[in-house]
Amino acid sequence: MPNLCTALEGIQKSCDNNSGGIYQVWYVPQDSIDVVTTNTTYPDYEVTAITLSPAAPTTQFTSFFVRRNTSNYTEETAADLINGSTFVTQTINLVFHRREMAKSNALKILGSGQQYLSAVVLDANGKYWYFPYMQLTATGEGSGVARADGSKYTVTTVAENEQLAMEVNLLNPAAYTLLGLV
């Protein structure tokens, strides 16, 4: 007896160039998010609007710039066939060069209180991706060994969500600036 909860959807062959890595990530406390509007009609599956609460202490996303070829995100789906549960572990790995007190403080605030964060990632293909309910789970690195190593921070934020990250395609182009996503 077939048990198809949702009709299958195909993946078309793409002729577009494909690049790895990320250019930038923005975070905002999850509590600052008022509404996330999505289009879940095939083939779009995208975030079309993000509204931040006017009462929130943070009214824009905060930018974290990363250097090329240093940072990435991964998404791994785990399905328990016995319990019938499925979730996606989303991990954003960031590297920040040159250790200094301002960066140390920014990372301390990012992880304070083990708060939930919403993240938007700009990948090397020029696409924005939305990751809700992230938490800072690790920071590391240090001075390096050789002079050429340079000092750096590594930062990991992780979430467990029900679906893969959704592409952000805001219907109002000015909204990117209003949200600080530039």
Where would I find each of the regions flagged by the language model?
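Charged, amphipathic alpha-helical segments
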Residues: 2-9, 87-109
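Mixed-charge, glycine-accented linear interaction segment located at domain edges/termini
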Residues: 134-182
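Solvent-exposed edge beta-strands and adjacent loop segments
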Residues: 2-6, 11-89, 135-147
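Oligomerization/assembly interface segments of phage tail-like spikes and tubes
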Residues: 80-101, 149-164
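Short acidic, glycine/tyrosine-flanked loop/strand segments centered on an H-E-D-like triad
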Residues: 89-96, 123-142
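Short, acidic/charged, Gly/Pro-enriched secondary-structure junctions
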Residues: 107-130
